[in-house]
């Protein structure tokens, strides 16, 4: 299974700039932050905020609080808008496994998978 989104906004921040509900995250100088159009209304739970998402094989930490329709990540460098982001699955040799994520938040992997809402488009691929 592969659960992906894409970068919808990318910005280089200044020291002290804040993002997210309640200005929960304060950026460092020169940090690249990106917005993804996925949030808890899509089933990407708020308690998954401590996870890393995968961008071209880089583990990118979620910053701030997962919002209703979006979340933000820190990037190691600038990436273009539209760059694919892997929430669950494999990306350039790195893997985000729902069972591993579930252990960190005190649940099971199936709860993460079953929580993905109907707002998220699905593509079914026959690998045979």
Predicted regions located by residue number:
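Active-site anion/phosphate-binding pocket segments in diverse small-molecule metabolic enzymes
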Residues: 1-128
């Amino acid at each position: 299974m592969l659960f992906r989104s894409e970068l919808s906004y990318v910005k280089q921040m200044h020291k002290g700039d804040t993002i997210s509900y309640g200005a929960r995250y304060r950026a460092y100088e020169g940090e690249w932050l990106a917005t993804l159009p996925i949030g808890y209304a899509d089933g990407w739970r708020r308690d998954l905020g401590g996870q890393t998402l995968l961008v071209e094989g880089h583990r990118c930490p979620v910053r701030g609080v997962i919002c209703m329709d979006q979340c933000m990540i820190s990037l190691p460098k600038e990436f273009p808008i539209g760059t694919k982001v892997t929430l669950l699955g494999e990306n350039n040799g790195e893997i985000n496994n729902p069972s591993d994520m579930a252990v960190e938040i005190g649940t099971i992997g199936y709860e993460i998978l079953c929580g993905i809402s109907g707002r998220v488009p699905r593509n079914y691929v026959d690998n045979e």
